[in-house]
Amino acid sequence: MASPKDFISPVNSGQKLVYPFRNYLNYLHDKYSDLQTGKIADYIPELALAAPQWFGISVITTDGQIFEVGDCQQTFTVQSISKAFVFGLALEDHGREYVNSKVGVEPTGEAFNSIILDEKTNRPYNPMVNAGAIATTDLITGQNATERLKRILEMFKRYTGRDHEINVPVFLSEKSTGNRNRAMAYLMLNFGMVSDKIEETLDLYCQQCAILVHAHDLALMAATLANGGVNPITGIRAIDEHYVQDVISVMLTCGMYDASGEWAYRVGLPAKSGVGGGITAVVPHQLGIGTFSPLLDEKGNSIRGVKICQNISEDFGLHLFNVAKPERDLKTWLEGNS
């Protein structure tokens, strides 16, 4: 099997140069396709129907180049990845100060579904855990539940350039097993962190988690954030540029469940994962990464997805705090692909 070193230089193929980034992604896909460790999420019954061999990698640059390999059009439910983008919509609806009065931005070190609030402020710790995400969803404005859901779906369309559907069986499955989320919501209601529209907000939260996406969508959503909030394919603004830093800051510190510290240390990119098997990762000003594989580690993160992002970050020196000159120049690898 080839290694990244085999792709260091462009190859002269007839009259044009074929650059290696597409081959590099093929190499990574081949390398990790046989990785069968991990477990498909089954605490939501419908999620257990995913096939373990599904595996896709998509990379989209801020100038609109697309590089993909594997099952990049296989749909799955977005799950917790929705939290980052709904957080951005709440910021647009209410502004930074008000949103931060309801939801903090501190990592917890606890499981994503922990029933725990900040003892001093009674806020959920951050928008990426379930309690914080429920509080964030509660902030989405609209005259009724239908309008609020429509606004979330329209927001997704701005990021991806296409209409999205909800997987109704997954929504109903999550709703029927959602007593823990209901307990969180009522605890927050007791402290005035959410409105009294508990059942409406919980339904909306379960619906946003059941939105169908694929790896291409996740790469484009990340590329949109990397591009200052403007979709690099459609040119449509998906989020006010002033709130992009809020979203990706919390993704960096809290986006990978209780493995977020390890992720920030080893990968160093703003990212969000979901138990459906997706990961979206942002390389500011450069590109977005979207991966899909439903085999999860004990933290709830896609094992193959984590490996892919770690490889790309290390091989091209993309860690946000990297100060060493990378061995490979990303721009050279990206240009000239066909």
From Swiss-Prot:
Task: Quote the catalytic activity from the record.
Answer: L-glutamine + H2O = L-glutamate + NH4(+)
Q: Which residues bind substrate?
A: S80, N130, E174, N181, Y205, Y257, V275
What is the official name of this protein in its record?
Answer: Glutaminase
Q: Which lineage?
A: Bacteria, Bacillati, Cyanobacteriota, Cyanophyceae, Oscillatoriophycideae
Per UniProt, subunit arrangement is:
Homotetramer.
Question: Which NCBIfam families does this entry report, sorted A to Z?
Answer: Gln_ase (TIGR03814)
Q: Its Enzyme Commission number?
A: 3.5.1.2
* Keyword line: Hydrolase
Q: Which organism is it from?
A: Microcystis aeruginosa (strain NIES-843 / IAM M-2473)
